[in-house]
C-alpha cells in the first residue's frame, strides 16, 4: 500500500469519556501512524466530529447551522490530533475546503499531494465545506482526490454487522462485503452518496475497531480483524 486515507471516528478518539479527547488513545494512534509513515506509506487523515457535536440529533437548530457546527468540530479535532502527532516528531498539514487562515490551509489537491509525497501527515478537516453532506462523503471525496489505495475507517465498532451489535447479541460480522450489498441492505455503514462515490471510483475500504491493539498497523498490513468492503 502506497497511500492510505485514514478516517478516525471522533467518538472513538473520546474513549470511554464519550466527549472530548482521550489523550492516551490519540497518542497511541499517533505512534501507529508514525510507524506506517516511517515504513513508506503516505497517510491522509479525516476525523469525524462526533466527540463534540452530532447535529442530526438536534431538533431546535437549523440543519445548515447544525452541519456548520459539525464542520468546525472536525477542524478542532484535526488541530488537536495534529499537535499530538507533532509532539512525537511528525510533520503535518491541515487543509479545509473553506478559509480558516489562522489555523489551516485552503484545500488544494496539488498542495496536498506534495505534502504527502514529502512524508507529511495530511489532515482534511471541514468535510466538503457544505451542509447536508456527512463526514463520510468528505472522506471518500478526499480519498479519491489524493488517489488513495484504500480508506481505513477506524471506529468504535470493529466492523460491519448484519444488525446493530449493541442491540442484537447474535449480530453477524462480515469479513468481507461488496459495497453494492452495503447499499442494497442499508447496513448504515456510510451514507448513500458516499457509498455511490466509493462504487463509482472503485475505492475499497476496511472498517475496523480503533481500540484493538495496533489495529491501524495491522490493517495497513492486510491483517485487520475488521470488515473489508470490496468494490
Model regions and ranges:
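C-terminal catalytic "cap/lid" subdomain
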Residues: 1-231
Amino acid at each position: 500500500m502506497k497511500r492510505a486515507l485514514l478516517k478516525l471516528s471522533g467518538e472513538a478518539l473520546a474513549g470511554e469519556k464519550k466527549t472530548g479527547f482521550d489523550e492516551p488513545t490519540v497518542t497511541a494512534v499517533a505512534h501507529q501512524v508514525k510507524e506506517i509513515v516511517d515504513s513508506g506509506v503516505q497517510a491522509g487523515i479525516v476525523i469525524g466530529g462526533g466527540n463534540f457535536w452530532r447535529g442530526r440529533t438536534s431538533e431546535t437548530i437549523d440543519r445548515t447551522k447544525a452541519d456548520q457546527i459539525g464542520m468546525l468540530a472536525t477542524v478542532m479535532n484535526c488541530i488537536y490530533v495534529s499537535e499530538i502527532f507533532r509532539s512525537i516528531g511528525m510533520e503535518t498539514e491541515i487543509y479545509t475546503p473553506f478559509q480558516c487562515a489562522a489555523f489551516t490551509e485552503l484545500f488544494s489537491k496539488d498542495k496536498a499531494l506534495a505534502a504527502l509525497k514529502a512524508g507529511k501527515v495530511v489532515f482534511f478537516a471541514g468535510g466538503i465545506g457544505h451542509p447536508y453532506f456527512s463526514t463520510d462523503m468528505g472522506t471518500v471525496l478526499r480519498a479519491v482526490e489524493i488517489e488513495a489505495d484504500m480508506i481505513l475507517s477506524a471506529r468504535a465498532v470493529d466492523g460491519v454487522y448484519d444488525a446493530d451489535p449493541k442491540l442484537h447479541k447474535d449480530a453477524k460480522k462480515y469479513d468481507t462485503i461488496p459495497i453494492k450489498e452495503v447499499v442494497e441492505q442499508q447496513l448504515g455503514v456510510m451514507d448513500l452518496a458516499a457509498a455511490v462515490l466509493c462504487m463509482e471510483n472503485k475505492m475499497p475500504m476496511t472498517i475496523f475497531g480503533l481500540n484493538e491493539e495496533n489495529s491501524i498497523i495491522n490493517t495497513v498490513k492486510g491483517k485487520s480483524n475488521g470488515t473489508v468492503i470490496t468494490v
